[in-house]
A protein has these predicted regions:
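Contiguous segments within soluble domain cores/interaction surfaces
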Residues: 21, 29-66
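Beta-strand signatures of extracellular beta-sandwich domains
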Residues: 49-53, 179-181, 356-358
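Bacterial Sec-dependent N-terminal signal peptides
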Residues: 1-24
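Surface-exposed loop/edge segments in extracytoplasmic proteins
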Residues: 56-64, 97, 187-193, 364-366
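Extracytoplasmic beta-strand/coil segments of soluble accessory domains associated
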Residues: 320-357, 390-391, 396-406
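Surface-exposed, low-complexity/disordered segments
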Residues: 27-31, 78-83, 92-199, 203-329, ...
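Ligand-binding face of N-terminal immunoglobulin V-set domains in extracellular IgSF glycoproteins
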Residues: 39, 65, 70-78, 85-87
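Periplasmic plug
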Residues: 340-384, 414
């Protein structure tokens, strides 16, 4: 009890300690649609959050990984932003204090009723464009509409939260009946089983994941029901009560040149028509997918058995493959829920201890849907025969199906799960 009380006191002291972060941006002003590089320096943190807001809404944000108290990342400014000042706020999850600065954004291509800018031409040929304000450029806590809440400290990596609808089809499920998970879609296993903080809020402690990744959020009950789940924004959305008017001294040729560069940048970052999308591959695209070699530094173990289905194209469904080709997997029913069990060659079946079943990293809730899936779309079946623990879940083995694309090639969508592309913190080298 003493240890627990001491831990709580220590956490409170950390949350109340002084938070100081220096913020640097790579430019004194920005065009809507440009990339804004943000550099943060602070102490005692692994993850920092940078968000850009006007008085109405969150405009953009980024999660920054810190190495030695320093980190740099990029905020892609939407091309539709109105002209005016925005407030750039930087904070950590476990501290109520926030560092802020004003950022000038101009949009010469689109006028908006929200514009709060005075355009002043620069006549001196040696002077570059610059921003100014009559009201001053400092912001205090009193200028903000809301105070930042204090949350749990991120000690290992980025924390994700999600809301689970625990009342479904007339049945109410409690926290101990719900298994929330987040998984990265791809050819390697990045699976995180979460914890229910209460009956509706799930929390996930992720680590080792960086950059833009396709992921799947799911919440399954002990009876195999897939509950609706939705990610909670990682940003606090700290809105200012008011912002000063932007006085922008502009040099026409400089703004025009930057505008052309911005438009080229927007074309470069726009998703290509052939960019892989979850579950939307055509057959030809699926066949063209080049599988990545398994990386044992990711999961920590290589599969005990690997089946390459290039050698067995005669099977039409996964069920046929498991029956005729893979001898160490069996379908069982546990409390009316279909499950798959895995055994080693020299072991008997453990009928009541199911395996973790994944397809392209996504947990399979409906096993029968998987068994009816087109086996010709599967490239590898990887089988891990040991006991594995994910969060509060314990599994006897892992059965991992890898499609040729690694992007859930035409796999029937699991009901109520959330598919999205998420920006994890970029890896910053020391």
């Amino acid at each position: 009890m003493f240890y627990r009380i001491s831990s709580i006191i220590a956490a409170l002291l950390l949350s109340l300690s002084t938070f100081a972060a220096s913020i640097e941006t790579d430019r004194p002003w920005y065009l809507a649609g440009e990339a804004m590089k943000v550099s943060v320096t602070t102490d005692n943190a692994l993850i920092a959050y940078a968000e850009l807001c006007d008085t109405r809404t969150l405009a953009a944000g980024v999660v920054i990984s810190l190495q030695g108290g320093k980190g740099t990342s990029t905020i892609e400014l939407p091309s539709y932003l109105h002209s005016g000042y925005y407030v750039l706020s930087v904070y950590t999850r476990d501290n109520a204090n926030v560092s802020r600065r004003l950022v000038a954004v101009v949009n010469p291509l689109h006028k908006s009723e929200d514009d709060d800018i005075e355009w002043v031409p620069v006549t001196d040929t040696d002077t570059q464009s610059y921003s100014a304000t009559i009201d001053g450029e400092s912001l205090s806590t009193a200028d903000m509409a809301d105070e930042k809440a204090v949350d749990v400290r991120e000690t290992e990596g980025h924390i994700i939260k999600a809301h689970v609808k625990n009342v479904y089809n007339g049945t109410t499920y409690r926290a101990n009946q719900i298994r929330p998970s987040v998984s990265i879609v791809g050819k390697q296993i990045h699976y995180f089983e979460g914890k229910m903080l209460n009956d509706t809020i799930a929390i996930f402690h992720t680590y080792g994941i960086h950059g833009k990744q396709p992921l799947v959020l799911s919440a399954a009950t002990h009876t195999g029901v897939s509950l609706p789940i939705e990610m909670i924004s990682p940003f606090a959305s700290l809105l200012p009560k008011k912002l000063p008017r932007l006085v922008f001294h502009y040099k026409r040729n400089e703004v025009e040149a930057r505008s052309l560069d911005m438009q080229r940048h927007q074309i470069a970052i726009a998703p290509a028509s052939s960019e892989p999308q979850l579950g939307s591959y055509h057959d030809a695209e699926a066949e063209d997918g080049v599988p990545l070699d398994y990386d044992d530094t990711v999961f920590g173990a290589k599969p005990d058995l690997t089946y390459n289905l290039d050698e067995y194209r005669q099977f039409l469904t996964i069920g046929e493959v498991l029956t005729e080709y893979v001898n160490c997997v069996r379908r069982i029913k546990n409390n009316g829920v279909a499950q798959l069990t895995v055994r080693s060659v020299d072991e008997s079946y453990v009928f009541t201890w199911p395996a973790m079943v994944l397809i392209d990293g996504m947990p399979v809730i409906d096993v029968d849907r998987l068994l009816n899936y087109d086996a010709r779309r599967i490239h590898y079946i990887n089988i891990y025969g040991n006991q594995y623990t994910f969060g509060n879940g314990v599994y006897r083995g892992i059965l991992s199906f890898v499609t040729r694309s690694g992007r859930l090639t035409n796999y029937p969508t699991e009901p109520n799960v959330q598919y999205l592309v998420y920006e994890f913190p970029e890896l910053n080298e020391k």
